[in-house]
């Protein structure tokens, strides 16, 4: 049983995980307003996995520009730039710097962010990769507090926030709390057309693995594989 479970988990962990979940949102996503055509093209280029060097050059160029006079657009572009720097550069320091820039704009203009929970939890995710535990916990806690205070604004940021919270608890060996957080993330996902549900089931399988509950591990590992094929 343990060998089979280990094989399933190893297979799952070789796939794209929630650690890479913050791809640049599509230009026609859930936005409070429409992006200009040239900005849509910039987002496409920043997210071009087939031309990473050009994407990084563009990201570095945009990061060097002075802030936009439009807070909404500044946050949008900064998040996209940070995402590119995070995905395509080994050291997350540059991604952190640009995401912090987006957060600073949000602090001044709270209504300018379409998804504050995503903005905050993404930064926490970057801090986690850098090993900045205190800052990671601080911003993820803020993201969670925002979700709790705004249940009527349910969106993908809710899913990300509680998945990130689960990862933080897992890192600390607090698996019961990690299970509670990932279960909540799954609940939110199911309310959003099962958004990234395969990754969430994979994460839940990993927590059951740490708890040595192998039947449950197998169940959620298989669910993750099944949903990933849909």
Report each predicted region and the residues it spans:
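TPR/TPR-like alpha-solenoid signature
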Residues: 39-40, 79-80, 121, 163, ...
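Residue-level detector of the short coil/turn that links helix A to helix B
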Residues: 50, 89-90, 131, 173, ...
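Residue register of alpha-helical TPR repeats
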Residues: 37, 76, 118, 156-160, ...
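Amphipathic alpha-helical segments of tetratricopeptide repeats
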Residues: 60-64, 100-108, 141-149, 183-190, ...
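N-terminal leader/linker segments that initiate helical-solenoid repeat arrays
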Residues: 20-83, 87-93, 97, 114-115
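Residue-level recognition of tetratricopeptide repeat
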Residues: 44, 83-84, 118, 125, ...
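Bacterial Sec-dependent N-terminal signal peptides
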Residues: 1-42, 123, 216
